[in-house]
Amino acid sequence: MSRSQNEEFQQWWNKQRDRNNHDVLYAGDDEAFLTVEIRTPATVDPDKDRIRTRTVRQLSRLYLLKFKQLASSFLWIGNSFLYLVRTANRRIANDNPPSVSSSARLYRLIKGFLVVVVLLLCFELAAYFKGWHFTPPSVASAEVAVEVVYAWWLEIRASYLAPPLQSLTNVCIVLFLIQSVDRLVLVLGCFWIKLRRIKPVASMEYPTKLVGEGVRLEDYPMVIVQIPMCNEKEVYQQSIGAVCMLDWPRERMLVQVLDDSSELDVQQLIKAEVQKWQQRGVRIVYRHRLIRTGYKAGNLKAAMNCEYVKDYEFVAIFDADFQPPADFLKKTVPHFKGNEELALVQTRWAFVNKDENLLTRLQNINLSFHFEVEQQVNGVFINFFGFNGTAGVWRIKALEDCGGWLERTTVEDMDIAVRAHLCGWKFIYLNDVKCLCELPESYEAYKKQQYRWHSGPMQLFRLCFFDILRSKVSAAKKANMIFLFFLLRKLILPFYSFTLFCVILPLTMFFPEANLPSWVVCYIPGIMSILNIIPAPRSFPFIVPYLLFENTMSVTKFGAMISGLFKFDSSYEWVVTKKLGRSSEADLVAYAESGSLVESTTIQRSSSDSGLTELSKLGAAKKAGKTKRNRLYRTEIALAFILLAASVRSLLSAQGIHFYFLLFQGITFVIVGLDLIGEQVS
């Protein structure tokens, strides 16, 4: 049966419609007619293909570049890991056992703690794989010997061990909160000072020119400038040069170079430097003690016993690595005018090597907070703070009134500040006057410095506690000095930092009945770290390393605090902080090229004109010196294994925040223990 013509037309029409989707069929009002509009396919723009092709080519190149970067990153990580492994092996092989001291005692204690933690971890791992973490066995239902032992352990742990641990945890949390509130109050005080633009204002100002404009030579007080030093051949030139270029009448200033060096070549270099400045007309004297008793305090005390000191009114003190600006005395001495109760004007430190390595960056965070917040707030609101030992000007009458320099502790600067405050003297801190200095670049030097800074205050607190109670100052000042200055900021801070994060936290992983909240482990410390970094905003990328490193340093600070409190022999050791003279050699060459000294009122790196011959001698002395090497710190390594073992236990308990904190804190202890954080000596 043949199809009708309409059916054939319909099939043809459907084929045409499928070929060209742009064909449109219009039905008019008149049903007898159909209008068909056939549109030709749109022509392809050749530029679009070219653009599409170019885009694909660019994407392929971009992905290839990303792949190469990713591959190089993995290669760098692999090489870094291999380097760390080789470095660790080398330092373990070359390690020398520590001497018998308080640090060795602490190491033995931590080593025993590590053995206990490892045994507990093995026990918990066995229990975990047995499935006892789902249904802990009881003594009555236990069948196997191991199960019986574990059941007994659970009962002893819950009944006898966890309660005292929880009590200690609660005490440390309270101390932690008190210290956090103190830190917050200091920051708010600093904000208030900035908001109200509060700062000490001198009653007079010295003109740019020394004499003239209504100022006579007699208007400049007599000032002694002291530079105590000991075997610091890397930095003696820059400190002597900077002090000799102070903008002050030469007839009204005397520079004392107080050299306690035991090395003969260093003595000769310093003596030659002094003679050259004498030839330039500077009133400068060289003093060397044959009997070096009392360390820095004994050195300063001997210098103040000179007969000519009675003719002077003020004394400025600079350590060997400090370079004061030329207008230092013009900005500090005027504050004494008309303020007879003022004993000390302290200025801020600025660091020439703060970006040298990770260790110096982290130190810069701490010291920026110390000067910007602690010293400034205490200076504005209570006129008392700890003297920093350098970059300050003392009224000689105040030094004599409080008994002068004493050799009873390793923090003679804090000692004399406390005694002066108890005698009724006031202090001023100038945050806008800065002196360049160096930060220790090696972990060994920094560790020794921190040990001295934290053992000395405990010695001093033990010695002057009853003097504080018997003093005639107000009860509020006594309370501030005992509870805030000594107990909270010098004793409680290192105690709870070490106990809470290095002892209690890993123990709570093995004693789950004792709870340490997550906000104590992570959130509050994070907020406190942010507050600490505010004075150094460029250091915000280092907030996590800073938090972890501060917990690591709590071991050293805790050991130093215990040593000073209980009169261990190590608390009386004085070790001069090693300097590298980062700013001396380059400036010496610059001077040799220019042929003249540059005087400036801005902070700059300056040195004396001792000549390139002396520089070559200095370089030869450096090469002939003792070979330096990085050390292995066993206490930190042992604590690293404790924290890493606790992180494994927290992983079994599915405690996320605790696990990550313990893991990264343990890795930080490994890095510090292998001495990988500071200067690396190949």
Curated annotation (Swiss-Prot):
Topology of the protein relative to the lipid bilayer: Multi-pass membrane protein
Residues at the catalytic site: D260, D413
Alphabetized UniProt keyword annotations: Cell wall biogenesis/degradation, Glycosyltransferase, Golgi apparatus, Membrane, Phosphoprotein, Transferase, Transmembrane, Transmembrane helix
Molecular function GO terms recorded: glycosyltransferase activity; protein homodimerization activity
Enzyme class, UniProt record, top EC level: transferase
Phosphoserine modification, residue list: S608
Subcellular location, record wording: Golgi apparatus membrane
Transmembrane regions listed in the UniProt entry: 109-129, 173-193, 491-511, 516-536, 632-651, 657-677
Binding residues annotated for substrate, in chain numbering: D319, D321
SUPFAM superfamilies to which the protein is assigned, alphabetical: Nucleotide-diphospho-sugar transferases
Protein EC: 2.4.1.-
Null allele phenotype: Normal xyloglucan (XyG) levels. Plants missing several xyloglucan synthases (e.g. CSLC4, CSLC5, CSLC6, CSLC8 and CSLC12) have no detectable XyG levels and several associated phenotypes including reduced stems height and leaves area, as well as shorter root hairs and reduced pollen tube formation ability.
GO cellular component, one term: Golgi membrane
Tissues expressing this chain: Mainly expressed in flowers and seeds, and, to a lower extent, in seedlings, roots, leaves and stems.
GO biological process terms held by the UniProt record: cell wall organization; plant organ development; pollen tube development
Function: Probable beta-1,4-glucan synthase rather involved in the synthesis of the xyloglucan backbone than cellulose. Seems to work simultaneously with xyloglucan 6-xylosyltransferase. Xyloglucan is a noncellulosic polysaccharides of plant cell wall and consists of a glucan backbone substituted by xylose, galactose and fucose.
UniProt similarity note: Belongs to the glycosyltransferase 2 family. Plant cellulose synthase-like C subfamily.
Entries under PANTHER family matching the protein: GLUCOMANNAN 4-BETA-MANNOSYLTRANSFERASE 9, XYLOGLUCAN GLYCOSYLTRANSFERASE 6-RELATED
Quaternary data: Homodimer.
Protein name per Swiss-Prot or TrEMBL: Probable xyloglucan glycosyltransferase 6
Organism annotation: Arabidopsis thaliana (Mouse-ear cress)
